[in-house]
Amino acid sequence: MVVGKIIKISGPVVVAEGMKGSQMFEVVKVGNEGLTGEIIQLTEDEAIIQVYEETAGIKPGEGVTGTGAPLSVELGPGMLKAMYDGIQRPLNEIENATDSIYIPRGVSVPSISRVIKWDFEPTAAVGDEVITGDVIGTVQETASIVHKIMIPFGVSGKIKEIKSGSFTVEETVAVVETADGEKEIQMMQKWPVRKPRPSKGKQAPVIPLITGQRVEDTFFGLAKGGASAIPGPFGSGKTVTQHQLAKWSDVDVVVYIGCGERGNEMTEVIEEFPHLDDIKTGNKLMDRTVLIANTSNMPVAAREASVYTGITIAEYFRDQGLGVLLTADSTSRWAEAMREISGRLEEMPGEEGYPAYLSSKLAQFYERAGRVECLGSENKQGFVCIVGAVSPPGGDFSEPVTSNTLRIVKVFWALDANLARRRHFPAINWLTSYSLYIDDIAGWWQQNTAADWRSLRDEAMSLLQKEAELQEIVQLVGPDALPDRERVILEIARMLREDFLQQDAYHEVDSYCSPIKQYHMLKIIMTFYKKGLDAVAKGADPAGISAVTVKGDIARMKYLVEEEFVNTKVPEIINKMESELGALIK
């Protein structure tokens, strides 16, 4: 064990001497209070340490003790429904242990309870040959999730002993006879946060992640295993969009990282999620959620740790064959923490003061997303989707964090303050957003909705772009000066915006829209477009088309329950549309 001495303190950065024998990224205990820190630079016998707790009050001459291990997370039953800080300290347990609403410095509480006993059901038997990643038993962790206990990395052999019953995470549930001797298997394992968990290989992103948000699913779809960025200025709805994704996404587990954002936003999640039901299982949303709260008033160094802690937990659930959504709100705050620490280290600054390695750090994080074939002899597949919010100052998408993020991710949901001011939510700008997964996921949509899904989607997108071009003319000469065909295009684009893209996150029905309902809504609007053009070509007045009463039915379809809408209302609206538009033809 290496014991050094503090020689310099600069905010969250501490320099210690006498650290020869230490390793990069080793966790150390700093000062008399034993603050948790991590070595980020080694020079001869000096170590530069970033401290994950407030450094006020420590002074040169105090000791620094190495632990001999990198920053790691504990993985096992008990993580779901938990709320951690950036270095996986359980906030509820800290409050119970210290009777304080603040985190005392140097406090050390196990990340996973060592007291709770879990009912372990073995799925393997004595004599079975097992390899890394094989499931040997299960634990019903919450009503929604069956936690699979896996053989840890680097262990393979024959099961000599396996137990059944109630155990804590530290008790031995199985013994495996390996080439190096007997290995005891517990329900908990540790993993260094900076090291991606291995898999057999990545798979093509061909299945869409259904979020229930029409603009995201139909126009700018994210594939399972994909990465997406949500940049937007203040007040444009980043957090509500991420809450919607966490509530409704077609995943098994959600890891929500509040990275440097307001504490109130985490409070909203804690208050809301326990009362919301998961549409897949009917159980509470909190049963499938892990929260990592690293709010803006917590030490900046822990922001980086919170992002890596979150992705490691997500990869662990992925290795069980589950689908995981990781939302990070906001990666800009992590980048600002990097900038602050880089400045303390007196490194050469890059663009806008951010460190030169900003893009490689972002890439290391986003590249840990993916749909993979999991380790083990069974055919397990899991995925991690990453959705990172970006908060560009003043909504400037050319700033370094946004521009570097866009080089890495394949889906860009651009939030627009002007749309938010016009009360258009979700405020995703359909002209600047894009998805590079559309070609990959179109096959799934055509198979699960209808063969004309892609053509409808592309035609609707081109109408919205055409509307943007026509708006410049309309502002100069007014809509009445346009040809009849283009007046119909303006009306249909308005219907697409207001009746399809707009979605009420707080409405009981409209908060979530299934793929089938999305398809039929789009189909009705595009059918109205085609029939409207036919009517105009045969002499109908565009003003009359704008005044038909069926438009009211189209506007209300988003609030109808799916079964009623698809089975009864769709044919009714189509029939009414044909009769009303037919009556306009002279």
Curated annotation (Swiss-Prot):
Reaction(s) this enzyme catalyzes, per UniProt: ATP + H2O + 4 H(+)(in) = ADP + phosphate + 5 H(+)(out)
EC number per UniProt: 7.1.2.2
Gene3D superfamilies assigned to the protein according to its UniProt record, in alphabetical order: 2.40.30.20, 2.40.50.100, Bovine Mitochondrial F1-atpase, Atp Synthase Beta Chain, Chain D, domain 3, P-loop containing nucleotide triphosphate hydrolases
One Gene Ontology biological process: proton motive force-driven plasma membrane ATP synthesis
Chief place where the protein resides: membrane
Record's keyword terms, sorted: ATP synthesis, ATP-binding, Cell membrane, Hydrogen ion transport, Ion transport, Membrane, Nucleotide-binding, Translocase, Transport
Binding-site residues, ATP: 232-239
PROSITE patterns hit by this protein: ATPASE_ALPHA_BETA (PS00152)
Membrane topology field: Peripheral membrane protein
One annotated Gene Ontology cellular component of this protein: plasma membrane
Subcellular location: Cell membrane
Top-level taxon of the source organism: Archaea
GO MF annotations, alphabetized: ATP binding; proton-transporting ATP synthase activity, rotational mechanism; proton-transporting ATPase activity, rotational mechanism
SUPFAM superfamilies in the record: C-terminal domain of alpha and beta subunits of F1 ATP synthase (SSF47917), N-terminal domain of alpha and beta subunits of F1 ATP synthase (SSF50615), P-loop containing nucleoside triphosphate hydrolases (SSF52540)
Keyword Hydrolase tagged: no
Database matches in HAMAP family: ATP_synth_A_arch (MF_00309)
Family per similarity comment: Belongs to the ATPase alpha/beta chains family.
Function: Component of the A-type ATP synthase that produces ATP from ADP in the presence of a proton gradient across the membrane. The A chain is the catalytic subunit.
Assembly behavior: Has multiple subunits with at least A(3), B(3), C, D, E, F, H, I and proteolipid K(x).
Protein name, UniProt field: A-type ATP synthase subunit A
